[in-house]
Amino acid sequence: MEKILRVDKIQKYYGNKDNLTKAIDGISFDVEEGEFIGIMGASGSGKTTLLNCISTIDTVSSGHIYLEEQDITEIKEENIAKFRRDNLGFIFQDFNLLDTLTIEENIALILTINKIPEKDIDNKVKEFAKKLGIEDILNKYPYQVSGGQKQRCASARAIVNSPKIILADEPTGALDSKSAKQLLETLENMNSKLKATILMVTHDPLSASY
């Protein structure tokens, strides 16, 4: 399989030499196309920092991160937003949905920003909404649906643009046990049937076992 992500000896420090905090200390690993990898660790162990560095939200102190053959630690500031839109999908613990947009509009947002034709947007949104079991709530707003439905909306938004990799940061953290299990099954389905490559960080052993 093709190597999608390569993390090479990255370090991330905060503070100064008199009060230095090591958030990440020399981590290396690879993610191949089609894999669903879970990284488990306690709160404060650097999991979110790791995802932030991979997603270009934060910068590394040293080391390199490659998405396919591109060293993303070298991307210029003015090109970062486009890089994220073109290559990455995100699923956050707190959903990060816009309350003023419907579920359908939230899923479609990245396609709209990328100026995809309206007919294609409509077809793609409906396709993924059906596959993730939320086609009946597309006209509702986030505050009108459950936490589990919000997270499935976020999952649809993450995959609708066919990203090279989906980054999931504690995606079950705000869900009850039933909704968490349903979401994990959704992610597993996205990986096995929709061929999504997923890197998830979590403190939950059940989530990591998927």
Question: Which ranges hold each PLM region?
Answer:
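Exposed loop/turn and edge beta-strand positions of beta-sandwich/beta-sheet ligand-binding modules
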Residues: 1
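ABC family nucleotide-binding domain
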Residues: 4-5, 10-210
